[in-house]
Design a protein with these regions (language model features):
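Helical element adjacent to the flavin cofactor pocket in flavoenzyme catalytic cores
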Residues: 153-162
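Dinucleotide-binding Rossmann-like beta1-alpha1 core, especially the glycine-rich loop
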Residues: 62-144, 150
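Residue-level detector of anion-binding/catalytic polar loops
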Residues: 19, 44, 129
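N-terminal Rossmann-fold NAD(P) dinucleotide-binding loop
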Residues: 31-32
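Glycine-rich Rossmann-fold phosphate-binding loop(s) that bind the pyrophosphate
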Residues: 26-28, 50
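A short small-residue
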Residues: 5, 9, 59-68
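Extreme N-terminal leader/targeting segments of oxidoreductases
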Residues: 1-22, 37-41
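Glycine-rich FAD pyrophosphate-binding loop
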Residues: 39-59
């Protein structure tokens, strides 16, 4: 089970060092990863957060680790972030709540499929595992759904993190 929750006490571990190379302000996902990589590079880092590390805004962003639907210029960065998330739990020896569950976009109308087909060319150019789903495939995937979607797009390597 992921070790951080609303019941986990906010802790401060004094004393702060007299000197450090870098102070990172903000203990959300960006601040934590910045501090982590700077420390791995040999810098002495102090991470400051007003409340709970990884328990403020980062805990409410839906947690998507998503490549699908990204701007083509962002896609290589999103793919690298996905790779980092896959390796991070092993590297730090903790369950970070990352689950590779895939991300599914559903078409509300037939015209939405054209947009999905457009984006698929970028996914293919980067060897991403995105694929289009027919109406029948979506219905089989979501048999209890009340809506009748004309199709969808899924990237199985996408996921979520807590």
């Amino acid at each position: 089970m992921f070790p951080i929750s609303e019941t986990s006490p906010v802790q401060f571990r004094p004393p702060l060092p007299d000197l450090c190379d870098t102070v990172v302000i903000g203990g959300g996902v960006i601040g934590v990863m910045t501090a982590w990589h700077l420390a791995k590079a040999g810098q002495t880092v102090v991470l400051c957060e007003k409340g709970r590390i990884a328990g403020e805004q980062s805990s409410r962003n839906w947690g998507w680790v998503r490549q699908q639907g990204r701007d083509p210029a962002e896609l290589p960065i999103a793919m690298e972030a996905n790779r980092i998330w896959q390796d991070l739990a092993k590297e730090c020896g903790e369950d970070l709540g990352f689950r590779q569950t895939g991300v599914l976009y559903l078409a509300n109308k037939a015209g939405d499929m054209a947009g999905f087909e457009n984006w698929l060319q970028f996914a293919k150019a980067h060897q991403l595992d995105t694929k289009l789903l027919s109406k029948a495939e979506v219905s089989a995937m979501l048999p209890s759904a009340r809506a009748d979607w004309p199709g969808g797009m899924i990237t199985p390597s996408d996921g979520r993190a807590e």
